[in-house]
Amino acid sequence: MMSTSDAPLDPVEFIHSRIRTVPDWPQPGVMFRDITPLLQSAKALRVLVDLFVERYVDAKLDYIAGLDARGFIIAPIVAYELSVGFVPIRKVGKLPYATQRESYALEYGTATVEIHEDACKPGDRVVIVDDLIATGGTMMAGKNLLERLGAVVVEGAAIVDLPDLGGSALLRGAGLPLYTVTEFPGH
């Protein structure tokens, strides 16, 4: 296991440097923050996972919940390293058992995510993980679902925060503490 101190830069700067910006994708005016270069580097992935593990090792968690789809990349690895369970929060229609659903607003329309109704029990301590926080809608929906099941949502966590889009302020305003590794200005 590599320690974050083995990274060539400050761990946060190292992670930030591995995130590619793709202008005008998926539409003009959007600066897409692409985490695939980060994931392709074993060293960068190890540093990233270690940052999350070091943050939550003493948090007495029961689960790490991952948001569909890119939250599924990091969340199970962190859950494994912490020896806790993983809870998927999926786009609607992807879970085979009885579910609870939560819809949230998009720029043009709505989306819905769901969780198995037996994914956790009252009092379970959970951290929600995603790749980035933009408008905050998906993470807020995940928080609402977990709380509906009686879980204690300890924190929301993401690799990237896009604070100019207002999601992190929205989530904090709703009482959800947040941890993000790095942030980028703009859209």
Curated annotation (Swiss-Prot):
Pathway recorded for this protein: Purine metabolism; AMP biosynthesis via salvage pathway; AMP from adenine: step 1/1
UniProt subunit comment: Homodimer.
NCBIfam families cross-referenced by the UniProt entry: apt, PRK02304.1-3, PRK02304.1-5
Top-level taxon of the source organism: Bacteria
Pfam families given in the database record: Pribosyltran (PF00156)
Keyword annotations of the record: Cytoplasm, Glycosyltransferase, Purine salvage, Transferase
Gene coding for it: apt
EC number of the protein: 2.4.2.7
Family annotation (HAMAP family): Aden_phosphoribosyltr (MF_00004)
Catalytic activity: AMP + diphosphate = 5-phospho-alpha-D-ribose 1-diphosphate + adenine
GO cellular component: cytoplasm
Residue ranges of the TM segments: none
UniProt source species: Burkholderia pseudomallei (strain K96243)
Principal subcellular localization: cytoplasm
Task performed by this protein: Catalyzes a salvage reaction resulting in the formation of AMP, that is energically less costly than de novo synthesis.
GO biological process, one term: AMP salvage
InterPro entries attached to this UniProt entry: Ade_phspho_trans (IPR005764), PRibTrfase_dom (IPR000836), PRTase-like (IPR029057), UPRTase/APRTase (IPR050054)
Protein family according to the UniProt entry: Belongs to the purine/pyrimidine phosphoribosyltransferase family.
Protein name: Adenine phosphoribosyltransferase
Subcellular location per the Swiss-Prot or TrEMBL entry: Cytoplasm
Cross-referenced PROSITE patterns: PUR_PYR_PR_TRANSFER
